[in-house]
């Protein structure tokens, strides 16, 4: 019998986009599937909208608001699949994503091989999705994957992964103590527990950049900064458990330097710990530098003013792009239908 795949979808205040995400899940060409939606205490109509899809293979649960990790764990505990596909409630799967990954995994003997796939980001129009290849888009060993992620500041979007139940049970549940980068920590742990990553170029993920993504913005939240720091230490621990070498130490220091601006200078406690850890790894962290357009503000108005200005204009640029795409999306869809465009032809879109 062919393996059963469980598509686990955590959702919080997702009524605007969950229809398209569920359509992409239902449209999967792999027939042996179940879809588990976990409404994490939404205050909008997320649960009501999701229940329109309820069927023998689509089950919707509602829970108190406990966060992403708890919602995913709730879904995994109740699913029956041999493989688990996590899908955020505003992202889309290409129709044959799961089928292509399972075809690739059927050619290997171990259930500890982890499947990944290409991903790209879009705002409203999927045909304008940008797929930007990086060095993670290939077959890699666990240590090579973590080295590149941490040493080159790369990542793979959550839905790219297809995880066997055996591998998920070995890696353990999502960490419910983390409030930021809980997905990054979890999949780093899954990678460490795996016997390798099989990259499947035919399957695609469409990652929506929307207002809901602002939940992942760390800002000035000390809870999120504490969580990020814990996740970073775990990343370093996972990589060093696989290999202790000069290249690993260098990648770990680079990784800390990448995220250093989130703590400097407002969290001197974390800054001091990071410097101590960098010294242990035979490295040193330097004060963050700004883009040349903002660096001149630092000696005149101070570090915080430069940081605030850079963050403001970066956010403004992204907001203007999103609003423009929204306007074009409304213009293109208004003459035909008020129903969101079907996602079944995503495979043909670039």
Task: Say what each PLM segment does.
Residues 268-350:
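Membrane-interface aromatic/basic loop that binds lipid-linked glycans or pyrophosphate carriers
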Residues 229, 249, 253, 268-275:
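Conserved positions within tetratricopeptide repeat
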């Amino acid at each position: 019998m062919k393996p059963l795949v469980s598509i686990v979808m955590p959702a919080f205040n997702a009524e605007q986009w969950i229809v398209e995400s569920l359509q992409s899940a239902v449209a999967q060409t792999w027939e042996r599937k179940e879809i588990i939606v976990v409404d994490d205490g939404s205050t909008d109509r997320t649960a009501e909208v999701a229940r329109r899809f309820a069927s023998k293979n689509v089950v919707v649960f509602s829970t108190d608001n406990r966060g992403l990790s708890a919602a995913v764990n709730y879904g995994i505990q109740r699913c029956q699949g041999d493989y688990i596909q996590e899908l955020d409630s505003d992202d889309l799967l290409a129709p044959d994503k799961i089928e292509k990954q399972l075809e690739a995994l059927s050619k290997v003997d171990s259930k500890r091989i982890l499947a990944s796939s290409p991903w790209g980001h879009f705002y409203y129009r999927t045909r304008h999705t940008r797929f930007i290849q990086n060095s993670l888009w290939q077959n890699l060993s666990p240590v090579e994957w973590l080295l590149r992620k941490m040493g080159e500041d790369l990542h793979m979007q959550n839905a790219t992964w297809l995880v066997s139940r055996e591998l998920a049970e070995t890696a353990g549940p999502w960490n419910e103590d983390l409030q930021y980068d809980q997905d990054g920590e979890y999949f780093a742990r899954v990678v460490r527990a795996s016997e390798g990553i099989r990259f499947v170029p035919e399957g695609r993920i469409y990652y929506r950049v929307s207002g809901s993504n602002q939940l992942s913005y760390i800002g000035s939240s000390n809870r999120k900064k504490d969580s990020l720091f814990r996740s970073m230490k775990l990343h370093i621990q996972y990589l060093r458990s696989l290999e202790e070498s000069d290249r690993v130490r260098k990648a770990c220091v680079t990784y800390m330097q990448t995220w250093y601006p989130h703590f400097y200078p407002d969290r001197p406690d974390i800054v001091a710990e990071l410097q101590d850890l960098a010294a242990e790894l035979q490295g040193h962290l330097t004060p963050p530098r700004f883009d040349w357009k903002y660096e001149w503000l630092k000696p005149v108005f101070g570090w915080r003013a430069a940081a605030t200005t850079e963050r403001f204009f970066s956010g403004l640029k992204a907001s203007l792009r999103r609003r423009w795409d929204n306007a074009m999306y409304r213009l293109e869809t208004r003459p035909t239908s008020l129903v969101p465009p079907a996602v079944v032809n995503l495979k043909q879109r670039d």
